[in-house]
Amino acid sequence: MAHPHLLAERISRLSSSLEKGLYERSHAIRLCLLAALSGESVFLLGPPGIAKSLIARRLKFAFQNARAFEYLMTRFSTPEEVFGPLSIQALKDEGRYERLTSGYLPEAEIVFLDEIWKAGPAILNTLLTAINERQFRNGAHVEKIPMRLLVAASNELPEADSSLEALYDRMLIRLWLDKVQDKANFRSMLTSQQDENDNPVPDALQVTDEEYERWQKEIGEITLPDHVFELIFMLRQQLDKLPDAPYVSDRRWKKAIRLLQASAFFSGRSAVAPVDLILLKDCLWYDAQSLNLIQQQIDVLMTGHAWQQQGMLTRLGAIVQRHLQLQQQQSDKTALTVIRLGGIFSRRQQYQLPVNVTASTLTLLLQKPLKLHDMEVVHISFERNALEQWLSKGGEIRGKLNGIGFAQKLNLEVDSAQHLVVRDVSLQGSTLALPGSSAEGLPGEIKQQLEELESDWRKQHALFSEQQKCLFIPGDWLGRIEASLQDVSAQIRQAQQC
């Protein structure tokens, strides 16, 4: 076997060659190439004239001496037009029912069948055997067929509960294509002088028969780590809970795993990685509704669980709560004690803030959380001037709950110990306390836990950075995963600065 990274580079260059002159079809070419290299089938859905047949023709050039067969199905198509005509000579001389398969599907490595759902039962039944077993019964003999890639295309989906569902289930990769959207790409397509049928692939990049056969064995040796299986099982369970989720057969799951193994193999890895699971978005959908649903579920999996994002946020939440508990345990020591002013005959008792409280905005911790204005509150931010005026003159006082949003009206009072007490609607009170001195920093327990969490984040980010070098995964998906990891990092840093 070639060095894994050299193989990955070669497949990347091969794909780039195949993509030349095709606009906004990179993802389709790459997945069709992956399907061809792993012996799977592809269904292309889209309107006429968007290069579906050209994609299939291009894939022939990925292999040395590959033969191609393409056919446009109609309601009147016969098996002879797909699998070859009957040999009149054999029937006449020997009474043998035998087809002449040269130049037809049974002897082609790359097969493209357009308007696939218009095929009749006789063609469909033979095609199912060809896809499943890579065999063709020719008279009394069963012949092995060399098909590496079947690309089926249509501008419509098969009717539900029809005889076509069995064939549709064999199409592992399903791609929904549309016309060229980008203005610059549209202009380039219109003015291109390239002959679309020319071979764009250098000989050195083409796959030999020996390489193809060897790779099939090596793909099967790619391992499925436990943590990746757990992600797959999580996705399967989540889909089973959704009422509108498509039915995914055990056969489709098993074939999808081999595709993930191929993705890892041709990316230079020895094991399936979480990033490979993004390919499932093109394997598990059935129709337009399920396409969106599958993408949403895989997005949740990738941005919330694949690199432990949600787990790290849960741990962070527990650390923050513990930090608050430690702060609240110190609240009696740091309770804000205001200074009483005036004599005993004053009409209203007046107070002022201690001289060492100088910040323009005061953040005071609740000794115990209270529910204020439908929010669980652990600290309140006051404008110093507003609090001083209330201590001196009384009236209305407002503060920002948990330091966010608009300042809300509060039920605040000074108790007999000259501590500030805030009360909820049921008049339960909580003493307000100054946070610990900034010089004290984070408690050692909290600091250590945050450092351990940050270390785990770095490991997960390093894994993602290493795994994201995958030709078959669109860049926008990788961008969303990176953003989810950076969000976790930002929240960890924020907690470290508290």
Curated annotation (Swiss-Prot):
<dbReference type="GO" id="GO:0005737">
    <property type="term" value="C:cytoplasm"/>
</dbReference>
<comment type="similarity">
    <text>Belongs to the RavA family.</text>
</comment>
<keyword id="KW-0547">Nucleotide-binding</keyword>
<dbReference type="InterPro" id="IPR045427">
    <property type="entry name" value="MoxR"/>
</dbReference>
<dbReference type="InterPro" id="IPR046932">
    <property type="entry name" value="RavA_LARA_sf"/>
</dbReference>
<dbReference type="Pfam" id="PF17868">
    <property type="entry name" value="AAA_lid_8"/>
</dbReference>
<feature type="binding site">
    <location>
        <position position="51"/>
    </location>
    <ligand>
        <name>ADP</name>
    </ligand>
</feature>
<keyword id="KW-0143">Chaperone</keyword>
<protein>
    <recommendedName>
        <fullName>Regulatory ATPase RavA</fullName>
        <ecNumber>3.6.1.-</ecNumber>
    </recommendedName>
</protein>
<dbReference type="InterPro" id="IPR003593">
    <property type="entry name" value="AAA+_ATPase"/>
</dbReference>
<feature type="binding site">
    <location>
        <position position="23"/>
    </location>
    <ligand>
        <name>ADP</name>
    </ligand>
</feature>
<dbReference type="Pfam" id="PF20030">
    <property type="entry name" value="bpMoxR"/>
</dbReference>
<feature type="binding site">
    <location>
        <position position="196"/>
    </location>
    <ligand>
        <name>ADP</name>
    </ligand>
</feature>
<comment type="function">
    <text>Component of the RavA-ViaA chaperone complex, which may act on the membrane to optimize the function of some of the respiratory chains. RavA functions as an ATPase.</text>
</comment>
<dbReference type="GO" id="GO:0016887">
    <property type="term" value="F:ATP hydrolysis activity"/>
</dbReference>
<dbReference type="InterPro" id="IPR027417">
    <property type="entry name" value="P-loop_NTPase"/>
</dbReference>
<dbReference type="InterPro" id="IPR022547">
    <property type="entry name" value="ATPase_RavA_C"/>
</dbReference>
<feature type="binding site">
    <location>
        <position position="54"/>
    </location>
    <ligand>
        <name>ADP</name>
    </ligand>
</feature>
<feature type="binding site">
    <location>
        <position position="50"/>
    </location>
    <ligand>
        <name>ADP</name>
    </ligand>
</feature>
<dbReference type="InterPro" id="IPR050513">
    <property type="entry name" value="RavA_ATPases"/>
</dbReference>
<feature type="binding site">
    <location>
        <position position="53"/>
    </location>
    <ligand>
        <name>ADP</name>
    </ligand>
</feature>
<feature type="binding site">
    <location>
        <position position="49"/>
    </location>
    <ligand>
        <name>ADP</name>
    </ligand>
</feature>
<dbReference type="Pfam" id="PF12592">
    <property type="entry name" value="ATPase_RavA_C"/>
</dbReference>
<dbReference type="InterPro" id="IPR046898">
    <property type="entry name" value="RavA_LARA_dom"/>
</dbReference>
<dbReference type="InterPro" id="IPR023671">
    <property type="entry name" value="ATPase_RavA"/>
</dbReference>
<keyword id="KW-0963">Cytoplasm</keyword>
<dbReference type="Pfam" id="PF20265">
    <property type="entry name" value="LARA_dom"/>
</dbReference>
<dbReference type="InterPro" id="IPR041538">
    <property type="entry name" value="RavA-like_AAA_lid"/>
</dbReference>
<comment type="subunit">
    <text>Homohexamer. Interacts with ViaA.</text>
</comment>
<keyword id="KW-0378">Hydrolase</keyword>
<feature type="binding site">
    <location>
        <position position="52"/>
    </location>
    <ligand>
        <name>ADP</name>
    </ligand>
</feature>
<dbReference type="GO" id="GO:0005524">
    <property type="term" value="F:ATP binding"/>
</dbReference>
<keyword id="KW-0067">ATP-binding</keyword>
